[in-house]
Amino acid sequence: MPSVERTGLGTIVIGVDTSGSIGEEELEQFAGEISALADEAKPEAIYVVYCDAAVQAFQQFGPSEPIHLEPKGGGGTDFRPVFEWVEANNIAPVCLIYLTDLCCYSYPPIPEYPVLWVTDSRRMAPFGETVRITAD
């Protein structure tokens, strides 16, 4: 019997912190996390939004597209622009996942969708759920 590949979730937005405090090692770890999420959850669409103090670029991936990240940035840090980008582009994500070191104090108002902060630091975000990842 032929197999049918289904999508599991709706649209996911992934904010990637590309500020100056994020190095190549962290970006590689973030890329691995995004690829694992795409393989496991099979969302309908993934928007990867690169942000330092402003949104620098974004990429959109479909459910079966290979994930190849092209990060842009290197300045200061502000988390608000990713959330503003979601609203400005009329995207209704099932969740927003932010990959960051949490070295920032500029948080947006709490959105209506769930937010997961994925970090390699011991800091905690003021809303949503904070998950710590460690290097393998």
Predicted segments with their positions:
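Generic recognition of flexible, low-complexity loop/linker segments
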Residues: 1-3, 34-37, 83-86, 104-105
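Short, structured coil segments at secondary-structure junctions
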Residues: 111-113, 126
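Von Willebrand factor
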Residues: 47, 51-106, 119-121, 132-136
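Redox- and metal-dependent alpha/beta enzyme cores, enriched for Fe-S-associated oxidoreductases
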Residues: 18-28, 32-67
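Residues at the starts of beta-strands that form the adenosine-phosphate
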Residues: 11, 45-47, 95, 114
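Acidic, polar low-complexity linker/tail segments
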Residues: 1-13, 25
